[in-house]
């Protein structure tokens, strides 16, 4: 089957990009590709044949129909207007046309210098491409909206970061790479007609049912806000901290995008900061819902030329509603509740307080709770708490709450085990794969990808364990 590509972004939004070609790496070689995703997209296996070199995965060739561009956008970074940004190391190669008429961006990260590289070198390093490939696939299999990773290419090109590292490229796929920052770019350049063109593009291609509706812009922004709310709720329920929620890292489609200094909670710490450059804790775990709203407010400002203030405020209210509703639903599922009752939040917050005092592992606590039987006086979960009396008091209230529902243990446990993962991408697991890959051993990278495809399967190995001492509180930076 021949892959078909279109260039809607290039054809319809000429002010938003610079056309250019990727700059290949030295001795580039394919070290990993996403076989399952490739099969779903009917990508010919021959394209992954190592005897053909790095090919399109390393920017050495283009496929018919590809029209590569680097996109320009702006944004607020750490709450401060940063001005023009853009694809400083990435190139949108083209948009794959799928059988249902939708498209999928092929975006090559680490593809070389662009007009938007600023002081950078246009490159990505092996460490960061491995982290993004693992994180995006982990999030996908957790059921969280995200970009996807299709391939990683390593090379002999040296790249200087804090130390000298190895240049690499990642092929990232997404329904769209449209960001809040695209709208900010033209708003602050005082070009409102181009802001409206971006909105028209989004509605035409992603919400076509509203094209001929009088209130199409208000409806569209309301949906952007709701998607963002549901996304943040998903992050909070799995203990995911993005690390760098700048407005240029926010997706119009409500996707998790731009994996940098992210981290999944080990010990439950609501103030967890994944990014060691975030000295003020702006992007700490428990502040993500507030930051997302702040970012939506910045986006709303750009839409004031063609959406009424009241409609914008209604959309922002929709964010809060979507966030709280979705978060509540997810957390009740994690606790094994099939109905909503007025004291559920209090019971959840009591558990969180107990976990915070004890330094309980976030993922393991909920997974172990999903195996606990109502009638059990003792359990492996109880044994993880030092203050057994406090746990017993909470568990008695929890057990009483479960008894209000006509659901047996087996059905409850089944539901809980579908939403409480046994495995998440802890930073130490990613680092172990990176360390091996930097020595030329890709086995752990491939093995970890396979493990992350089954996050709700119980394991008795270290993929589901608490981190070792060296793996606790690993510092992660924005450097990529």
From Swiss-Prot:
Organism: Salmonella paratyphi B (strain ATCC BAA-1250 / SPB7)
Swiss-Prot/TrEMBL cofactor(s): Mg(2+); Mn(2+)
Record's catalysed reaction(s): L-seryl-[protein] + ATP = 3-O-(5'-adenylyl)-L-seryl-[protein] + diphosphate; L-threonyl-[protein] + ATP = 3-O-(5'-adenylyl)-L-threonyl-[protein] + diphosphate; L-tyrosyl-[protein] + ATP = O-(5'-adenylyl)-L-tyrosyl-[protein] + diphosphate; L-histidyl-[protein] + UTP = N(tele)-(5'-uridylyl)-L-histidyl-[protein] + diphosphate
Function: Nucleotidyltransferase involved in the post-translational modification of proteins. It can catalyze the addition of adenosine monophosphate (AMP) or uridine monophosphate (UMP) to a protein, resulting in modifications known as AMPylation and UMPylation.
Protein name (database record): Protein nucleotidyltransferase YdiU
Organism placement in taxonomy: Bacteria, Pseudomonadati, Pseudomonadota, Gammaproteobacteria, Enterobacterales
InterPro entries documented for this protein: adnlytase_SelO, SelO
Family of the protein in this entry: Belongs to the SELO family.
Broad class of enzyme this protein falls into: transferase
Keywords: ATP-binding, Magnesium, Manganese, Metal-binding, Nucleotide-binding, Nucleotidyltransferase, Transferase
Binding of Mg(2+), residues: 249, 258
Catalytic residues of the enzyme: 248
Gene field: ydiU
GO molecular function per UniProt: AMPylase activity; ATP binding; magnesium ion binding
Binding positions for ATP per the UniProt entry: 86, 88-89, 109, 121-122, 172, 179, 258
HAMAP family noted in UniProt: YdiU_SelO
EC number(s) reported in the record: 2.7.7.-, 2.7.7.108
Entry superkingdom: Bacteria
């Amino acid at each position: 089957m021949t892959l078909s590509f279109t260039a809607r972004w290039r054809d319809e939004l000429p002010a938003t990009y610079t056309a250019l070609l990727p700059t290949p790496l030295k001795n580039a070689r394919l070290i990993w590709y996403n076989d399952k995703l490739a099969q779903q997209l009917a990508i010919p296996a021959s394209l992954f044949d190592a005897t053909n070199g790095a090919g399109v995965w390393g920017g050495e060739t283009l496929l018919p129909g590809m029209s590569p561009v680097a996109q320009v956008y702006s944004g607020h970074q750490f709450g401060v207007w940063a001005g023009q940004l853009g694809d400083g190391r990435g190139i949108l190669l083209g948009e794959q046309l799928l059988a249902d008429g939708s498209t999928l961006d092929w975006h090559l990260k680490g593809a070389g210098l662009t007009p938007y590289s600023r002081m950078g070198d246009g490159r990505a390093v092996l460490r960061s491409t491995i982290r993004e490939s693992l994180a995006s696939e982990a999030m996908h299999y957790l059921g969280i909206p995200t970009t996807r990773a299709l391939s990683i290419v390593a090379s002999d090109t040296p790249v200087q970061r804090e130390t000298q590292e190895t240049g690499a490229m990642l092929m990232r796929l997404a329904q769209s790479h449209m960001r809040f920052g695209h709208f900010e770019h033209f708003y602050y350049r005082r070009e409102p007609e181009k802001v409206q063109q971006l909105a028209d593009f989004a509605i035409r291609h992603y919400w076509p049912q509203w094209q001929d509706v009088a209130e199409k812009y208000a409806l569209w922004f309301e949906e952007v806000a709701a998607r963002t709310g549901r996304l943040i709720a998903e992050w909070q329920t799995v203990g995911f901290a993005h690390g760098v929620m700048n407005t240029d890292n926010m997706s119009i489609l409500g996707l998790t995008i731009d994996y940098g200094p992210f981290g999944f909670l080990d010990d439950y710490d609501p103030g967890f900061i994944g990014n060691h450059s975030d000295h003020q804790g702006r992007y700490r775990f428990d502040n993500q819902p507030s930051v997302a709203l702040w970012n939506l407010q910045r986006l709303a400002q750009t839409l004031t030329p063609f959406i009424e203030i009241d409609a914008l405020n209604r959309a922002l209210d929709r964010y809060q509603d979507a966030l709280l509703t979705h978060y509540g639903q997810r957390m009740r599922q994690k606790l094994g509740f099939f109905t909503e009752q007025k004291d559920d939040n209090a019971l959840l917050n009591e558990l969180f307080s107990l976990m915070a005092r004890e330094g309980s592992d976030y993922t393991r606590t909920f997974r172990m709770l999903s195996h606990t039987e109502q009638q059990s006086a003792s359990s492996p979960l109880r044994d993880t708490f030092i203050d057994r009396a406090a746990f017993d008091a909470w568990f008695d209230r929890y057990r009483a709450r479960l008894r209000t529902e006509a659901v047996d243990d087996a059905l409850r446990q089944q539901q809980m085990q579908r939403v409480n993962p046994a495995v998440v991408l802890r930073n130490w697991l990613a680092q172990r794969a990176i360390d091996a890959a930097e020595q030329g051993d890709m086995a752990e990278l491939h093995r970890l990808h396979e493990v992350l495809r089954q996050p709700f399967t119980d394991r008795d190995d270290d993929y589901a364990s608490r981190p070792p001492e060296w793996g606790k509180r690993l510092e992660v930076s924005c450097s990529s």
